[in-house]
Amino acid sequence: MQEEILTTIHNIPIKRNFILNLPYNPSLKDRAKALRKAGNFSEVVFWKEVRNKSFWNIDFDRQRIIGNYIVDFYVKALGLVIEIDGEIHNFQE
């Protein structure tokens, strides 16, 4: 089976690599929606750079639920999670 190339960045092919069925906790849906609306400055700046496939035609999800967690950004086609630490992480135990 030939691997599908998602995009090419500076002549380097980026191949698809994703998990078909990630765990999902529907009770976190409202929290994820609230986090999307209230994003911290770093997340908002990052989102402005990558939304609408503007970064090498790669589709990013924001505040994606994976299991019992909400990750800042997720690229399904790559199986890639991006967490941007903000002030809130200083107060969690």
Q: Model-predicted segments: where are they?
A:
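Nucleic-acid endo/exonuclease domains
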Residues: 1-93
